[in-house]
């Protein structure tokens, strides 16, 4: 039961979910060179969260409708994530949009 108890422990920071909506469902498979460059800058933009160990998962998701981007990360406040998302090259270039949500509760493996 120690493993189950550990999974029930609260996270040290709130957890947030970001969803990137691309300009078309096939975006992950058929990016132009310009879009690929923007996506490289997008990944670098979130690098500080990855390097700090605050990004739980980050990358494209394929489903029956196409693709979209997912990030699950820890931060002090939702405003921090919203401000960072607003400066994302995907958003500033109009390549896509980013939505931010708060994970209210759940389980995270240790």
What is the predicted function of each stretch?
Residues 2-110:
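Conserved, structured core segments of small domains
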């Amino acid at each position: 039961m120690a493993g189950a108890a550990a999974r029930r422990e609260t996270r040290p920071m709130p957890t947030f979910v970001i969803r990137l909506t691309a300009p078309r469902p096939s975006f992950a498979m058929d990016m132009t060179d310009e879009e690929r460059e923007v996506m490289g800058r997008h990944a670098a933009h979130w690098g500080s969260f990855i390097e700090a160990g605050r990004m739980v998962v980050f990358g494209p998701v394929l489903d029956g409708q196409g693709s979209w981007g997912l990030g699950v990360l820890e931060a002090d406040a939702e405003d921090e994530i919203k401000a960072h998302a607003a400066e994302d090259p995907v958003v500033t270039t109009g390549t896509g949009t980013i939505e931010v949500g708060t994970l209210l509760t759940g389980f995270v493996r240790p």
